Amino acid sequence: ALARERSFTKAAKQLHITQQTLSNYVAQLEKEIGSTLFVRNIPLKLTYAGEIYLRYALAIQNQMENMQHELDDVSQKERGLLKIGIAFSRGRILMPKVIAAFQKEHPFVQVKLVETSNEEQRIKLLNHEIDLVITNFTEDIPGVTMQDFYDEENVLLISEVLLDKIYGADKESVLEKVAILQNLYPLKDCPFVLMNAENIAGRIGREFLAEAGFEADIKVESDNIETLLSLAIEGCGACFCPEILLRKTLSQETLAKLRVIRLGDKAKYRICFGYAKQNYQWKIIDEFVKVALDTIQE
């Protein structure tokens, strides 16, 4: 907690102990191992010795968890804490039904959702801070097993009000040109609201805009796709977003006020499960994956 928070105050609060207790513990630990673990600046920083200690501590913690999982599996005790990394919007769409179905079969397993960016999920997985991620992998990652979940597609969403305001009677011909050219240049006068580049929708959106060859008028950037979707509905700009988000969250009445532009194969990608390769694979991870696959096909 201290290495992550880089603050005695924040780490002590997270651990539900006093700052003095934590400070005394670290000082005693440093005395025992004969090395200084932290540079006590603001924020705190691990020394080289601290980085070594943390690496071994995380490895030991991971081995202890694996041992407990294997013992539970041998004794057929389905219990424990399953930590899952997933993007916030994807979690909102997928997890309620998946977790409900999973906990019917495994009522004594607690699920903790770590809702964060795709890149942060990968880092936490490699650091053994989470057991399973649900994300798009752009490349193979050493030490990580990947398994296909489902295919996702980004679309471009523009409100009819915004199209009428910018293009008037020409809006249908503009959209027809976009479809024929498979290029967004005809929309060069349209404002955009974009996810940040670290997110899938933000990355794909920027690739399409760069290919179109014009400098887009980006009105808003955000990490929250649902905020951007609401802005697009209000006519603030065109928005790149996952098609599944529209289908699962918007009413037919709202969809009728929007124009959805499909962008072809370049806007499609695969969502996968990812979990660290271990000497022993916790059975509960496989069980969760199985339930999720069954649920998505319903």
Language model regions located:
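Beta-alpha-beta core module
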Residues: 141-148, 152, 185, 226-278
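Short helix-boundary/capping micro-motifs
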Residues: 1-16, 43
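Hydrophobic hinge/microswitch elements
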Residues: 118, 126, 136, 198-259
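Alpha-helical linker/hinge and terminal dimerization helices associated
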Residues: 32-33, 53-75, 137, 292
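N-terminal winged-helix
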Residues: 19-20, 69, 75-106, 110-123
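Short beta-strand-centered segments that line the small-molecule binding cleft or hinge
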Residues: 98-101, 119-169
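A short LG(V/I)-centered, amphipathic sequence patch enriched
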Residues: 30-48
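Secondary-structure junction motif
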Residues: 164-167, 171-212, 281-290
